[in-house]
Amino acid sequence: MDKRWSLQGLTALVTGGASGIGHAIVEELAGFGAKIHVCDISKTLLNQSLSEWEKKGFQVSGSVCDASNRLERETLMQTVTTIFDGKLNILVNNVGTIRTKPTIEYEAEDFSFLISTNLESAYHLSQLSHPLLKASGNGIITFISSAAGIVSFDAASIYGLTKGALNQLARNLACEWAKDGIRANAVAPNFITTALAKPFLEDAGFNEILSSRTPLGRAGEPREVASLVAFLCLPAASYITGQTICVDGGLTVNGFSYQP
């Protein structure tokens, strides 16, 4: 295989990788030959996934971690440093969650929870990963953002601002860390068929609106996000950095349409 299209011999850390988009990303990266460490807050889901990946012959290890907790993030990176001998090629900041409320109904705890989970975790893990990414000689950071960080989603103002911040962080790190051989990009999905999105997608009215606003007429699948993440990590994508790329079925480019 052309080395441009292989991750053989490369190492990766995927946060929140035991389910949903993260799970699909692990499978995609492992399929290209990467050796991966996964962290997840759920011990049960993590163990189930690790067993599944072992049967598939993937090189995946894992540890339980609440990525919103600073001390647990530091412990995670100590583990990754040991496992990968001080070098890391790929960091996928995938952990994220949502709470939907009108803006005037959000409370301080909601703000703190969403900021620490969606934004602070990715920022701090990027800081902690920097020496490992630099040491690898070829570092790639991918932030899992959202279309909500680009266009307005009702009742999700805090979620949207955390995702918009990730898009900007990707731009900043792409410029600041390029000299260290590190690329950074953000991937911004539409609603994807995961457990997190299930309550929304099971609502017939919501689905009708989503389909009408999305040119491709449907929610996305986790593997459709994972395929882009994997591409951005490949040597073939070596000149792509600082970008926010939407995987949204056309949602963010859909304008106004009227047909009398």
UniProtKB/Swiss-Prot annotation:
> Where along the chain is NADP(+) bound?
13-37
What Pfam families does the database record attribute to this sequence? adh_short_C2 (PF13561)
GO cellular component annotations, sorted alphabetically?
Answer: peroxisome
In the UniProt record, does the keyword DNA damage occur?
no
- Binding residue positions for substrate: S146
Q: Which GO terms describe its molecular function?
A: oxidoreductase activity
Listed A to Z, the keywords are:
NADP, Oxidoreductase
Q: Origin, by domain of life? A: Eukaryota
Locate the active site.
Y159
Task: Tell me its family.
Answer: Belongs to the short-chain dehydrogenases/reductases (SDR) family. SDR65C subfamily.
Entry-linked PANTHER family: 3-OXOACYL-[ACYL-CARRIER-PROTEIN] REDUCTASE (PTHR42898:SF29), TROPINONE REDUCTASE (PTHR42898)
**What role does it play?**
Reductase active only on small flexible lipophilic carbonyls. No activity with cyclic monoterpenes, tropinone, nitrogen-containing tropinone analogs, tropine or pseudotropine as substrate.
**This protein's name:** Tropinone reductase homolog At2g29330
Q: What is the lineage of its organism?
A: Eukaryota, Viridiplantae, Streptophyta, Embryophyta, Tracheophyta
